[in-house]
Design a protein with these regions (language model features):
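A short beta-loop-alpha structural element at the N-terminal edge
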Residues: 15-29, 40
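Conserved GNAT-fold acetyl-CoA-binding loop/helix
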Residues: 32-58
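A short helix-loop-beta-strand connector motif used in the catalytic cores of GNAT acetyltransferases and
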Residues: 57-72, 108
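Conserved beta-strand in the GNAT
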Residues: 72, 82-93, 108, 113
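A conserved beta-turn-beta hairpin within the catalytic core of GNAT-like acetyltransferases
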Residues: 95-109, 119
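Conserved hydrophobic beta-strand within the GNAT/NAT acetyltransferase core sheet
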Residues: 109, 142-145
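Conserved acetyl-CoA pyrophosphate-binding loop and the N-cap/start of the following alpha-helix
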Residues: 118-130
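Conserved active-site alpha-helix within GNAT-family acetyltransferase domains
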Residues: 125, 137-138, 149-171
Length: 174
């Protein structure tokens, strides 16, 4: 788990906007790209119609929530909603019982994906900056994420660092 308490804002050369339901097919495509090219084990979902349907349904539910935002970058900024995307990122804010500092609001960043030909052009950084700014505006005092080794550099440049004494544990429930 990597965490950050603050970050810088925006990149003037990349136009980031909040996703709408019209973007769902492209968000699903970018999620498949993320899993098929970025995960440390083989995943093949881009042609799995059942997965694509379930992912689109989940995206529709999430986009309707006030505590969730997905930010995107269009191939052609003039095309707007529903056009081809080159990148996206999701962020959700959750309320927890507060610790000794803060209000107990934290954010979790996920599904950062940039099309392969567009990587290294600041798109990931711009998406990350917008996601952190939105989480901060919602009152989150902390943001966390999980990263593969290949994605770690962009997060570390934004101030994320390996978490302290707590270790992330997980378990399948179904």
């Amino acid at each position: 788990v990597l965490v950050a308490a603050s970050g810088r804002l925006g990149s003037a050369s990349v136009i980031v906007r909040r996703a709408t339901p019209a973007d769902i097919p492209e968000i699903v495509r970018l999620k498949a790209l993320l899993m098929e090219t970025g995960w440390p084990w083989p995943v093949a979902v881009s042609k799995d119609e059942d997965w694509r349907r379930r992912c689109a349904e989940a995206a529709e539910v999430l986009l309707a929530r006030d505590t969730y935002a997905c930010f995107v970058v269009d191939v052609d900024p003039l095309a707007g909603e529903g056009g081809s995307l080159v990148g996206c990122v999701s962020v959700a804010v959750e309320q927890h019982l507060p610790g000794p500092r803060g209000r107990g609001l934290s954010a979790y960043l996920s599904d950062m994906s940039t099309d392969v030909p567009h990587r290294g052009r600041g798109i990931g950084t711009a998406l990350l900056d917008h996601a952190m700014a939105w989480a901060r505006e919602q009152g989150a005092g902390r943001i966390e994420l999980h990263s593969t080794e290949s994605g770690r550099r962009v997060y570390e440049r934004a101030g994320f660092e390996a978490d302290g004494p707590f270790r992330h544990l997980g378990r399948q429930l179904v």
